[in-house]
Amino acid sequence: SGLQFAVLDGQGFLPFPRV
């Protein structure tokens, strides 16, 4: 991932940027 908004990622909701 690498988004700045909370989005449904492979590990769940990421409310912050992640690689």
From Swiss-Prot:
One of its GO terms (cellular component) is extracellular region. The keyword Secreted applies. It is found in: Secreted. The modification Valine amide is found at residue 19. Keywords: Amidation, Neuropeptide, Secreted. GO terms for biological process: neuropeptide signaling pathway. Mediates visceral muscle contractile activity (myotropic activity). Belongs to the periviscerokinin family. This is CAPA-Periviscerokinin-2.
